[in-house]
Amino acid sequence: MAGLKSLAKDTAIYGMSSIIGRFLNYLLVPLYTAVLPAASGGYGVVSNVYAYTALILVFLTFGMETGFFRFANKAGDDPKKVYANVLMFVGGLSLAFVALCLTFLHPIASFLEYPDHADYVAMMILVVALDSFQCIPFAYLRYQKRPIKFAGIKLFNIVGNILLNLFFLLLCPWLYKVQPGLIDWFYDPDYLVGYIFVANLIMSAVQMLFFIPELRGFSYRIDRKLLKEMIAYSFPILIFGLVGILNQTVDKMIYPFLFEDRQEGLVQLGIYSATSKVALVMAMFTQAFRYAYE
C-alpha cells in the first residue's frame, strides 16, 4: 500500500510539473508574436531552429535514458557504474558534436540557410549539447525517486527562461528608449531573435550547476563490455525516437523550402507554428474536459 501511495505521489509531481511547464512555455508564444515583427519572420526562425535542435537532442541522448533504467535495475549490474558509463558516453558524444559543429560552423549555417546568423546556430549547438548531457542526471533523479528536485529544476529552468525573455524582449527595449546609456553596452534592438537563444543558453548553463552533486562521487571508468551492451540495447530506441521526433518536427524543417522566397517561407512558418501551439493548448483543455465529463 505504501508503494502505491509513493507511486501516486511521484506521478502527481511529475505530471503536474510537466503540465505546468508546457503551459508556461506556451505563454511565450503571444510574447514572441507580439514583439517580433511579422514581416521579419522572427518566430519562423525560432520554430525552424528549435525543430532541428529537437531532432539532434534525440540523437545525442542515443536512447540512453531508457538504457540507463534497463541496466541500473538489472540484477548483477552496479547502478553507479551504469550511470557513470552513460554519462561518459553521452558527454563524449555531445563534446564531439560541439567540436565538429563549431569547426564547420559557417558551412552548417549556410546549409541551414542562416549564413548571416551563424551565431544562432552556435548558441543552439551549445544548448542542445548541454540539454542532452543533462538528460542523464535527470534520469538519475528519477531512478533515485527524487521527483521534487526533478520538478523543481525543470520549473526553475522554464520560469528563468521566461523572465530572461521578458527582460530582453520587453524591459530592454523600453530602457533603450528612455535611458539608452544604461544598456547600449550590451543590448542591440535589432537582435531580438538572437536574445531568445541567448536566454535559452543562459538557463541551460545555469541548470548545469544544479547537477554538480549528481556528477560527483562516481568512478568514471569505461566498462567496454557494459557500454557495448547498453549501446546495443539503446540503438533501436534511438531509431524509434528519431522517427517519432521527425513526425513532430519535419514540417517546421521543410516549410521554408516550400517557398521560392525564403523570407516569406519564414513568415508563413511563424504563423503556422503559432496557430499549431494554440491548437495544442486547446487539445489539452478538451482532453481534460472529456476526462471530467466521462
Describe every region a protein language model picked out.
Residues L60-G76, T275, A279-E294:
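Helix-loop junctions and terminal segments of transmembrane helices
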Residues L55, G91, L95-A99, T103, ...:
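Alpha-helical transmembrane segments of multi-pass membrane proteins
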